[in-house]
Regions:
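N-terminal secretory signal peptides and thylakoid transit peptides that target proteins
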Residues: 14-37, 41, 230
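Structured, non-membrane catalytic/scaffold regions adjacent to prosthetic-group chemistry
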Residues: 56-318
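Ser/Thr/Pro/Gly-rich low-complexity linker/stalk segments immediately outside membranes or between
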Residues: 47-56
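N-terminal secretory signal peptides
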Residues: 1-22, 49
Length: 318
Protein backbone atom coordinates (compact mmCIF):
# COMPACT_ATOMS: atom_id res chain seq x y z
CA UNK A 1 0.00 0.00 0.00
CA UNK A 2 1.24 3.48 -0.83
CA UNK A 3 1.15 5.63 2.30
CA UNK A 4 0.85 9.32 1.59
CA UNK A 5 2.76 11.96 3.48
CA UNK A 6 0.58 14.02 5.80
CA UNK A 7 1.08 17.02 3.53
CA UNK A 8 -0.56 15.03 0.73
CA UNK A 9 -3.55 13.90 2.79
CA UNK A 10 -6.75 15.88 2.58
CA UNK A 11 -8.99 16.06 5.64
CA UNK A 12 -11.85 14.43 3.78
CA UNK A 13 -9.70 11.36 3.03
CA UNK A 14 -9.31 10.51 6.71
CA UNK A 15 -12.45 11.95 8.26
CA UNK A 16 -15.64 10.71 6.54
CA UNK A 17 -16.65 13.45 4.11
CA UNK A 18 -20.16 13.97 5.45
CA UNK A 19 -18.86 14.23 9.01
CA UNK A 20 -16.03 16.58 8.02
CA UNK A 21 -18.39 18.89 6.12
CA UNK A 22 -21.07 18.79 8.83
CA UNK A 23 -18.58 19.70 11.55
CA UNK A 24 -17.21 22.57 9.45
CA UNK A 25 -20.75 23.77 8.71
CA UNK A 26 -21.61 23.63 12.40
CA UNK A 27 -18.52 25.64 13.33
CA UNK A 28 -19.05 28.20 10.59
CA UNK A 29 -22.61 28.84 11.72
CA UNK A 30 -21.83 29.25 15.40
CA UNK A 31 -22.10 32.66 17.03
CA UNK A 32 -20.74 32.55 20.54
CA UNK A 33 -20.13 35.97 22.04
CA UNK A 34 -18.53 37.60 25.04
CA UNK A 35 -16.77 34.67 26.71
CA UNK A 36 -13.32 35.50 25.45
CA UNK A 37 -13.33 38.78 27.32
CA UNK A 38 -13.72 36.94 30.63
CA UNK A 39 -10.24 35.49 30.60
CA UNK A 40 -7.44 37.12 32.51
CA UNK A 41 -4.64 35.71 30.41
CA UNK A 42 -2.73 37.55 27.69
CA UNK A 43 0.69 37.71 26.05
CA UNK A 44 2.76 40.42 24.38
CA UNK A 45 2.26 41.23 20.73
CA UNK A 46 5.85 40.83 19.63
CA UNK A 47 7.50 37.45 19.27
CA UNK A 48 11.10 36.67 20.11
CA UNK A 49 12.76 33.59 18.57
CA UNK A 50 14.65 33.04 21.82
CA UNK A 51 11.33 32.64 23.64
CA UNK A 52 10.01 29.81 21.48
CA UNK A 53 10.57 26.12 22.07
CA UNK A 54 13.27 24.83 19.74
CA UNK A 55 11.92 22.37 17.19
CA UNK A 56 13.65 19.03 17.57
CA UNK A 57 15.03 19.79 21.04
CA UNK A 58 15.73 16.47 22.76
CA UNK A 59 14.48 15.65 26.26
CA UNK A 60 17.03 13.98 28.52
CA UNK A 61 16.46 11.15 30.98
CA UNK A 62 13.31 9.68 29.46
CA UNK A 63 12.27 6.35 30.96
CA UNK A 64 10.20 3.68 29.25
CA UNK A 65 6.74 2.95 30.65
CA UNK A 66 4.89 -0.32 31.12
CA UNK A 67 1.73 1.60 30.20
CA UNK A 68 2.85 1.93 26.57
CA UNK A 69 1.21 0.03 23.73
CA UNK A 70 3.34 -2.05 21.38
CA UNK A 71 1.37 -0.94 18.32
CA UNK A 72 3.11 0.64 15.36
CA UNK A 73 3.85 4.31 15.97
CA UNK A 74 2.41 6.84 13.52
CA UNK A 75 5.16 8.73 11.64
CA UNK A 76 6.23 12.01 13.22
CA UNK A 77 5.49 14.05 10.11
CA UNK A 78 1.91 12.77 10.01
CA UNK A 79 1.24 13.60 13.67
CA UNK A 80 2.73 17.09 13.34
CA UNK A 81 0.97 18.03 10.11
CA UNK A 82 -2.57 16.73 10.70
CA UNK A 83 -3.85 18.65 13.70
CA UNK A 84 -7.18 19.64 15.17
CA UNK A 85 -6.21 22.89 16.84
CA UNK A 86 -8.94 25.44 16.25
CA UNK A 87 -7.08 28.18 18.10
CA UNK A 88 -4.97 28.30 14.94
CA UNK A 89 -7.28 26.98 12.22
CA UNK A 90 -10.16 24.62 11.52
CA UNK A 91 -8.11 23.18 8.64
CA UNK A 92 -5.96 20.30 9.86
CA UNK A 93 -3.07 21.08 7.54
CA UNK A 94 -2.67 24.70 8.68
CA UNK A 95 -1.69 24.71 12.41
CA UNK A 96 1.86 23.52 11.69
CA UNK A 97 2.60 26.67 9.73
CA UNK A 98 0.48 29.08 11.73
CA UNK A 99 1.95 27.95 15.07
CA UNK A 100 5.62 28.05 14.11
CA UNK A 101 6.24 31.39 15.86
CA UNK A 102 3.97 30.75 18.84
CA UNK A 103 5.77 31.91 21.98
CA UNK A 104 6.07 29.28 24.72
CA UNK A 105 8.58 31.04 26.97
CA UNK A 106 8.09 32.60 29.44
CA UNK A 107 5.05 30.52 30.41
CA UNK A 108 3.32 30.31 33.77
CA UNK A 109 0.83 27.70 34.97
CA UNK A 110 -1.54 28.84 37.70
CA UNK A 111 -3.11 26.23 40.04
CA UNK A 112 -5.94 27.25 42.35
CA UNK A 113 -9.50 26.56 43.44
CA UNK A 114 -10.28 23.97 46.11
CA UNK A 115 -6.68 23.30 47.14
CA UNK A 116 -4.55 23.79 50.24
CA UNK A 117 -1.72 25.24 48.17
CA UNK A 118 -2.39 27.75 45.43
CA UNK A 119 0.61 27.57 43.15
CA UNK A 120 2.22 29.28 40.19
CA UNK A 121 4.90 27.43 38.28
CA UNK A 122 7.07 28.35 35.36
CA UNK A 123 6.55 25.64 32.77
CA UNK A 124 10.15 24.46 33.06
CA UNK A 125 9.64 23.94 36.79
CA UNK A 126 6.53 21.88 36.06
CA UNK A 127 8.52 19.73 33.65
CA UNK A 128 11.16 19.03 36.32
CA UNK A 129 8.69 17.88 39.00
CA UNK A 130 8.96 14.20 38.04
CA UNK A 131 11.00 11.86 35.86
CA UNK A 132 9.84 12.03 32.23
CA UNK A 133 8.40 8.85 30.76
CA UNK A 134 7.68 7.81 27.21
CA UNK A 135 4.03 6.75 26.97
CA UNK A 136 3.11 5.24 23.62
CA UNK A 137 -0.64 5.79 23.52
CA UNK A 138 -3.43 5.31 21.05
CA UNK A 139 -5.14 8.62 20.29
CA UNK A 140 -8.71 8.56 18.94
CA UNK A 141 -10.48 11.56 17.42
CA UNK A 142 -14.26 11.86 17.69
CA UNK A 143 -14.25 12.37 13.90
CA UNK A 144 -13.32 8.72 13.40
CA UNK A 145 -9.54 8.73 12.81
CA UNK A 146 -6.75 7.60 15.11
CA UNK A 147 -2.98 7.71 15.59
CA UNK A 148 -0.37 6.13 17.88
CA UNK A 149 1.98 8.63 19.53
CA UNK A 150 5.03 8.26 21.83
CA UNK A 151 4.22 11.11 24.21
CA UNK A 152 6.68 12.29 26.88
CA UNK A 153 5.55 13.41 30.32
CA UNK A 154 4.52 12.00 33.67
CA UNK A 155 1.28 11.08 35.41
CA UNK A 156 -0.91 14.12 35.96
CA UNK A 157 -1.40 12.97 39.55
CA UNK A 158 2.19 14.00 40.34
CA UNK A 159 1.33 17.65 39.75
CA UNK A 160 -2.08 17.40 41.40
CA UNK A 161 -0.55 16.10 44.62
CA UNK A 162 1.66 19.20 44.86
CA UNK A 163 -1.45 21.38 45.21
CA UNK A 164 -3.02 19.17 47.91
CA UNK A 165 -6.65 19.29 46.74
CA UNK A 166 -9.33 19.64 49.42
CA UNK A 167 -11.90 16.94 50.01
CA UNK A 168 -14.56 18.98 48.21
CA UNK A 169 -12.50 19.04 45.00
CA UNK A 170 -14.45 16.72 42.71
CA UNK A 171 -13.31 18.01 39.32
CA UNK A 172 -10.26 19.49 37.64
CA UNK A 173 -10.64 22.23 35.03
CA UNK A 174 -7.98 23.04 32.42
CA UNK A 175 -7.83 26.35 30.56
CA UNK A 176 -5.83 26.99 27.40
CA UNK A 177 -4.06 30.30 26.85
CA UNK A 178 -6.07 33.08 25.23
CA UNK A 179 -3.74 34.81 22.77
CA UNK A 180 -5.59 35.96 19.64
CA UNK A 181 -2.54 37.97 18.58
CA UNK A 182 -0.69 34.66 18.21
CA UNK A 183 -3.60 32.27 17.62
CA UNK A 184 -5.55 33.50 14.59
CA UNK A 185 -8.36 31.02 15.14
CA UNK A 186 -9.25 32.80 18.39
CA UNK A 187 -10.13 35.89 16.38
CA UNK A 188 -13.15 33.99 15.07
CA UNK A 189 -16.07 32.90 17.22
CA UNK A 190 -16.04 29.31 16.02
CA UNK A 191 -15.88 28.23 19.67
CA UNK A 192 -16.08 29.94 23.04
CA UNK A 193 -12.58 31.08 23.98
CA UNK A 194 -10.45 30.36 25.88
CA UNK A 195 -10.70 26.60 25.45
CA UNK A 196 -11.76 24.83 28.64
CA UNK A 197 -11.78 21.11 29.40
CA UNK A 198 -12.30 19.12 32.56
CA UNK A 199 -12.02 15.77 34.25
CA UNK A 200 -13.51 14.16 37.29
CA UNK A 201 -10.92 14.00 40.07
CA UNK A 202 -10.58 10.21 39.97
CA UNK A 203 -10.03 10.40 36.20
CA UNK A 204 -7.31 13.01 36.61
CA UNK A 205 -5.62 10.92 39.30
CA UNK A 206 -5.59 7.73 37.21
CA UNK A 207 -2.02 6.69 36.27
CA UNK A 208 -2.88 6.74 32.55
CA UNK A 209 -3.76 10.46 32.63
CA UNK A 210 -0.61 12.15 31.35
CA UNK A 211 0.79 15.64 31.85
CA UNK A 212 2.65 15.97 28.58
CA UNK A 213 5.47 18.21 27.38
CA UNK A 214 7.06 16.14 24.63
CA UNK A 215 6.70 13.47 21.97
CA UNK A 216 9.05 11.34 19.90
CA UNK A 217 11.75 12.09 22.49
CA UNK A 218 11.61 15.84 21.81
CA UNK A 219 9.78 18.88 23.17
CA UNK A 220 6.21 19.25 21.96
CA UNK A 221 5.83 21.06 18.65
CA UNK A 222 3.66 24.14 18.95
CA UNK A 223 0.92 22.65 16.78
CA UNK A 224 0.64 19.64 19.09
CA UNK A 225 -0.03 21.60 22.27
CA UNK A 226 3.28 23.09 23.44
CA UNK A 227 4.49 23.76 25.97
CA UNK A 228 2.16 21.77 28.23
CA UNK A 229 -0.93 19.67 27.61
CA UNK A 230 -2.74 16.67 28.99
CA UNK A 231 -3.24 13.37 27.20
CA UNK A 232 -6.22 11.28 28.29
CA UNK A 233 -5.95 8.20 26.06
CA UNK A 234 -9.30 6.56 26.85
CA UNK A 235 -11.24 9.66 25.82
CA UNK A 236 -11.77 11.37 22.48
CA UNK A 237 -8.96 13.75 21.60
CA UNK A 238 -10.78 17.01 22.30
CA UNK A 239 -10.72 16.13 26.03
CA UNK A 240 -6.91 16.51 26.05
CA UNK A 241 -6.45 20.24 26.60
CA UNK A 242 -3.43 21.93 25.00
CA UNK A 243 -1.27 24.96 25.86
CA UNK A 244 -2.49 24.94 29.47
CA UNK A 245 -2.09 28.06 31.62
CA UNK A 246 -4.64 27.45 34.39
CA UNK A 247 -5.63 24.38 36.40
CA UNK A 248 -8.56 24.84 38.78
CA UNK A 249 -10.06 22.40 41.29
CA UNK A 250 -13.79 22.66 41.85
CA UNK A 251 -16.74 20.90 43.47
CA UNK A 252 -18.92 21.28 40.37
CA UNK A 253 -18.63 19.91 36.86
CA UNK A 254 -16.79 22.41 34.63
CA UNK A 255 -18.52 23.99 31.66
CA UNK A 256 -16.33 22.68 28.86
CA UNK A 257 -15.92 24.23 25.43
CA UNK A 258 -17.19 21.53 23.08
CA UNK A 259 -19.95 20.48 25.48
CA UNK A 260 -21.21 24.08 25.48
CA UNK A 261 -21.01 24.19 21.69
CA UNK A 262 -22.95 21.00 21.01
CA UNK A 263 -23.97 18.98 24.11
CA UNK A 264 -25.46 15.93 22.34
CA UNK A 265 -22.32 15.36 20.27
CA UNK A 266 -19.69 16.26 22.88
CA UNK A 267 -20.55 14.91 26.31
CA UNK A 268 -18.58 15.84 29.40
CA UNK A 269 -17.12 12.34 29.74
CA UNK A 270 -16.65 11.57 26.03
CA UNK A 271 -15.07 8.20 26.65
CA UNK A 272 -14.25 6.30 23.48
CA UNK A 273 -17.24 4.00 23.05
CA UNK A 274 -18.16 2.05 19.90
CA UNK A 275 -21.72 1.67 21.17
CA UNK A 276 -22.48 5.37 21.54
CA UNK A 277 -23.02 7.26 18.30
CA UNK A 278 -22.63 11.01 18.61
CA UNK A 279 -23.47 12.66 15.29
CA UNK A 280 -22.17 9.61 13.42
CA UNK A 281 -21.29 5.97 14.10
CA UNK A 282 -18.29 5.37 16.36
CA UNK A 283 -18.14 1.63 15.68
CA UNK A 284 -15.07 1.93 13.44
CA UNK A 285 -12.03 4.16 13.12
CA UNK A 286 -9.42 4.74 10.45
CA UNK A 287 -5.79 4.76 11.55
CA UNK A 288 -3.87 7.56 9.85
CA UNK A 289 -1.90 6.02 6.98
CA UNK A 290 -4.03 2.87 6.75
CA UNK A 291 -6.62 2.02 4.11
CA UNK A 292 -8.99 -0.30 5.96
CA UNK A 293 -11.06 0.83 8.95
CA UNK A 294 -10.63 -1.05 12.22
CA UNK A 295 -13.18 -1.70 15.00
CA UNK A 296 -13.23 0.89 17.77
CA UNK A 297 -12.24 -0.47 21.17
CA UNK A 298 -14.15 0.40 24.33
CA UNK A 299 -12.19 3.05 26.25
CA UNK A 300 -9.83 3.02 23.24
CA UNK A 301 -8.52 -0.31 24.52
CA UNK A 302 -7.62 1.00 27.99
CA UNK A 303 -9.67 -1.39 30.11
CA UNK A 304 -7.76 -0.25 33.21
CA UNK A 305 -10.17 2.67 33.55
CA UNK A 306 -13.40 0.65 33.41
CA UNK A 307 -13.70 0.67 37.20
CA UNK A 308 -13.98 4.46 37.19
CA UNK A 309 -17.41 4.13 35.59
CA UNK A 310 -18.76 1.10 37.45
CA UNK A 311 -22.54 1.24 37.64
CA UNK A 312 -22.82 4.22 35.29
CA UNK A 313 -24.97 4.25 32.19
CA UNK A 314 -22.30 5.17 29.64
CA UNK A 315 -24.86 6.05 26.99
CA UNK A 316 -26.57 8.51 29.29
CA UNK A 317 -23.27 9.69 30.74
CA UNK A 318 -21.49 10.13 27.44
Amino acid sequence: MLIKKASDIRSSEITPQDLYLNRRKFLTGMAVSGAAAATGFGVKELLSPSMRASAGQKIDGIQKSALSTTEKITPYNDVTHYNNYYEFSTQKEEPAGLAKDFKTRPWTVKIDGAVKKKLEFGVDDVIKLATPEERIYRHRCVEGWSIVVPWVGYSLSELIKKAEPLGKAKYVEFTTIYAPNQMPGQRREVLQWPYVEGLRMDEAMHPLALLCFGMYGEVLPNQDGAPLRVVIPWKYGFKSAKAIVHIRFTDSQPMTTWNLANPPAYGFYSNVNPNVDTYHSQAYERRLGEFRPRPTQMFNGYDQVAGLYSGMDLKKNY
